[in-house]
From Swiss-Prot:
GO terms for molecular function: lyase activity. PANTHER family: BETA-ELIMINATING LYASE-LIKE PROTEIN-RELATED, TRYPTOPHANASE. It comes from the Eukaryota. Keywords: Pyridoxal phosphate. This is Putative beta-eliminating lyase-like protein. It holds the Pfam family Beta_elim_lyase. GO terms for biological process: amino acid metabolic process. Its cofactor is pyridoxal 5'-phosphate. The modification N6-(pyridoxal phosphate)lysine is found at K32. The keyword Plastid does not apply. It comes from Dictyostelium discoideum. Belongs to the beta-eliminating lyase family.
Amino acid sequence: MSGESGFKNKSISEIVKEIYENIDGMTMSGKKDGNSNIGGFIATRHKEWYDKASIVNIIYEGYVTYGGMTGRDMGAMAQGLNESMDFEYLKSRCKQVEYLANKLDKYGVPFQRPFGEHALFIDAKKILGHIPIDDLIAQTLAIEIYLEGGVGSVEIGTLLADRDPITQEN
């Protein structure tokens, strides 16, 4: 793994802390590399943003102190976040995605580059171009990957992004 030379002797938690000290706000799903089965969070340093987000949170998720999560789930997410900052864990995750990228390259499967640490985005339209967009190409690919190999994946695009609010087209 490579990185910026100024961070060479810093721990993952020190790097994360420095990144977060320089942001105005963020969202995170604990189900990605937060190693949690549920949950996520919104953080901001702006009281006005917090107040607006709190209203929506209370309506849809629960009170701001727990966001609809049980104490057990909050504890699991906290533990998962700590574990996900372990260098060996992160190196392993990066190697897994790199392994997948190499296999896809070997078989000529098109994907976006550069790929990330926890995900790789396959270009479903290039693989299944004969399927009309309205028939949800990426959903079809995700389902077929699961049926064929038991590998869970998710569509990011046509269905997730929803239709254009004006034209109603994908």
